[in-house]
């Protein structure tokens, strides 16, 4: 059925191309000019007509009479996710009033013209829908662990790379510093390299630390960041001297993935948390790690605790809850994620 004053284009011209998740590069100046012209239109139907034409252009460049896809050699461009852009245009087409249509138009213009980030990450809040790699749910379900590049999964008890990656994307910017007090196989520092974060990892076992260092060095360091592996006991190690080496006073993210008490014995070292005689001693040792590390965490930043519960002789022991209680004793606030 034809709606009065609204251009009716063939359905195939309005359908997004097969790769709807790909980016579309637009002439920024001309696209904003067109959107601004649409905002200044008096009639809602006229607004919808122009938006329908814009959608057709995004689906078929041969229809680009506006020059939106005409990129000059030195011209300013903007890259937008095609499916998200089309969804935003659909909201305008479906708007019931001119005021609502203009609201969506002005929001789109603002998202193109401005970049709005905050202190703790590089996410552009005006275009947050484009960050598909950041999980926004509190329950995380991963089909499988990331085994790409230097992530070999050789170390028994290491955590999946997606966890530190998610935390760094959420809570750090490029160039920030990340401290991992239980480095293990080097998972955190490998992700630091990939994301352009400086990383320091403390590992009690010298052999494990050496293997981790070898793997980390195999990961390309395209961002020229620091990847420091230090052999030591996180309960007592002099973190200040390590930070002084790089002329920094604090880190922006603290990651802890301690042993799940004695489920896996990682060494024979008496200072290894997996050798704690009982839960009380384990928590005391863990508390010392927290005490030693948190003074170097920048105020307002995050400590990431990754730990699971355990069963022993038919009894469920809520290690996660107990460890969070230890963290709370240090006056930190808890924000929980499940995986």
Model-derived features with residue positions:
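Class I S-adenosyl-L-methionine-dependent methyltransferase catalytic core
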Residues: 1-339
């Amino acid at each position: 059925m034809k709606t009065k004053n609204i251009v009716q284009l063939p359905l195939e011209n309005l359908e997004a191309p097969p790769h709807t998740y790909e980016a579309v590069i637009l002439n920024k100046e001309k696209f904003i000019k067109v959107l601004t012209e649409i905002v200044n239109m008096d009639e809602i139907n006229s607004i919808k007509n122009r938006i329908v034409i814009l959608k057709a252009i995004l689906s078929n460049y041969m229809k680009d009479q506006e020059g939106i896809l005409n990129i000059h050699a030195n011209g300013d461009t903007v890259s937008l996710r095609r499916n998200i852009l089309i969804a935003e245009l659909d909201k305008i087409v479906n708007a019931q009033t001119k005021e609502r249509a203009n609201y969506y138009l002005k929001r789109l213009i603002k998202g193109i013209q401005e970049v709005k980030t905050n202190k703790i990450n590089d996410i552009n809040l005006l275009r947050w829908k484009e960050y598909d790699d950041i999980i926004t749910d509190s329950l995380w379900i991963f089909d499988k662990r990331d085994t790409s590049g230097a992530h070999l999964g050789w170390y028994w008890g290491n955590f999946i790379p997606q966890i530190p990656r998610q935390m760094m994307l959420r809570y750090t910017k490029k160039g920030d510093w990340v401290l991992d007090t239980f480095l293990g196989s080097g998972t955190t520092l490998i992700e630091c390299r990939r994301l352009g974060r400086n990383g320091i990892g403390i590992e009690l076992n010298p052999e494990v630390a050496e293997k981790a260092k070898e793997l980390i060095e195999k990961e390309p360091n395209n961002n020229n960041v620091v990847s420091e592996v230090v052999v030591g006991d996180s309960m007592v190690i002099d973190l200040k001297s390590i930070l002084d080496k790089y002329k920094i006073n604090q880190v922006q993210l603290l990651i802890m993935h301690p042993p799940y008490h004695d489920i896996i014995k990682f060494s024979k070292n008496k200072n290894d948390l997996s050798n704690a005689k009982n839960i009380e001693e384990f928590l005391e040792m863990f508390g010392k790690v927290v005490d030693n590390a948190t003074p170097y965490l920048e105020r307002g930043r995050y400590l990431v605790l990754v730990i699971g519960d355990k069963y022993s002789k038919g009894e469920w022991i809520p290690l996660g809850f107990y460890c969070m209680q230890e963290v709370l004793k240090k006056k930190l606030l808890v924000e929980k994620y499940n995986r």
